[in-house]
Amino acid sequence: MRTEYCGQLRLSHVGQQVTLCGWVNRRRDLGSLIFIDMRDREGIVQVFFDPDRADALKLASELRNEFCIQVTGTVRARDEKNINRDMATGEIEVLASSLTIINRADVLPLDSNHVNTEEARLKYRYLDLRRPEMAQRLKTRAKITSLVRRFMDDHGFLDIETPMLTKATPEGARDYLVPSRVHKGKFYALPQSPQLFKQLLMMSGFDRYYQIVKCFRDEDLRADRQPEFTQIDVETSFMTAPQVREVMEALVRHLWLEVKGVDLGDFPVMTFAEAERRYGSDKPDLRNPMELTDVADLLRSVEFAVFAGPANDPKGRVAALRVPGGASLTRKQIDEYGNFVKIYGAKGLAYIKVNERAKGLEGINSPVAKFLNAEIIEAILDRTAAQDGDMIFFGADNKKIVADAMGALRLKVGKDLGLTDESKWAPLWVIDFPMFEDDGEGGLTAMHHPFTSPKDMTAAELKAAPENAVANAYDMVINGYEVGGGSVRIHNGDMQQTVFGILGINEEEQREKFGFLLDALKYGTPPHAGLAFGLDRLTMLLTGTDNIRDVIAFPKTTAAACLMTEAPSFANPAALAELSIQVVKKAENN
């Protein structure tokens, strides 16, 4: 039906007769002439109808936005004065000789000239995806997956599929369950990741595996989360953590070079402890130049409990954040930041406004200055490298609250004051995470997952001091987003059972949930390691949007619903009966 795509026509096509298929993006009726912008997935081209082709001109008068049409005509160069430099096809136009209206369009529920609500865009997603910016994002996504496949194939990785209907295993979120009709009362689980299957593939001898795979997690959603999402899943045997990082870094550098024309360079490597200490986050945005500075040792003897308490507590921390040029902040802005950090558990926000250092105490403005002597203030200013015109904010509490609150404040202030360089790309690796973290109920939970190997510890050493264990794990972070994470896996049955025990999984439960894994570990398991990238998040970064729904063809809302198909929906009672399932309404509290 077509010979060319609208958006691919160039000066090289001048004089050629072409047939185009697509949609009316815009129509301009000048009486004796009608111009339309005709659109397909590759872009837009101007088509015009003149009186010499009366039948085509008459039919063109009926055209409206989003009519699906076919046009045959001749490509010709535009006059110099009519060239549109904002269009890829702006140097040419098509003189139509014939027009076919394939399908008409009703009055549109979306308005291309105004900002539509996200609800409307999701309900009429098939119309939303016609917009050039949305089409371009999905084309970029397709390019990314193609580049990934070629890179992985070139590096000896095998694309192997793993099951979608599997067994529920504890991986940190709730599973989506699928009832079995054949096995009454039993359920499959949709995989949160192919984690155990890819490890089993390593045990099967396939030493380089990858898969671009759907994963499912029934968790509370955020703007950058979806109940179903896509991973670039990777696993290797006989490779160390640095070797895995080297290959995966090369993949991501390849993507940025091919999609953005940007060489990311070598990725710096930072430990979890350093990232938390300097940036208050395990996924620091290095485009922001501000860092947290520890000042607890300077404040242990002050008669100000807000500072002295955490400064003398082994679990406490006092950190300063120097904001270049921050002395210009108004009292209202400072109060807003004070309320902001309370979201993260902080009790307030102390500060020192540095007006003129040379004047000592008279050169600063601070509500806490009366509790600190000149010597301590000078020491704080020296350590933070404060200059005239700067602001210093303080966080004082337990280590987690200080890291969370001051880390979030660092990001917000950096954005508000334009200190974060939005034109840069800042990738890094974060390594050496704690193996376990407090579950809030007196026990421990795996910081990554229970199949991650500890670093340089035997099973006996791990059992004796699990709180000191460092995971042989690594995350890739770009511009403050965790785009991928992985680890060296446990390949020893004794170590795996030790980890299960630390997590409170008794031997009976181990056999019930992971018996197949424990059995497989008995038969010459190779050392193995892997990583998974979030394809949706990578695409989000590479297309310049901050909404993950913009890079998924048919996404769910933050309530995990599809407004277009109205999923989820109630099941047919007969289907439920066949599955031996009865829906019980929850009793309402009076």
UniProtKB/Swiss-Prot annotation:
Homodimer. It holds the Pfam family tRNA-synt_2. It comes from Escherichia coli O157:H7 (strain EC4115 / EHEC). Its EC number is 6.1.1.12. It is found in: Cytoplasm. ATP binds at R217, D218, E219, Q226, E482, G534, L535, D536, R537. L-aspartate binds at E171, R217, H448, R489. The keyword Electron transport does not apply. This is Aspartate--tRNA ligase. GO terms for biological process: aspartyl-tRNA aminoacylation. The keyword RNA-binding does not apply. The lineage of its organism: Bacteria, Pseudomonadati, Pseudomonadota, Gammaproteobacteria, Enterobacterales. InterPro entries: Aa-tRNA-synt_II, aa-tRNA-synth_II, aa-tRNA-synth_II/BPL/LPL, Asp-tRNA-ligase_1, Asp-tRNA-ligase_1_N, Asp/Asn-tRNA-synth_IIb, AspRS_core, GAD-like_sf. The gene is aspS.
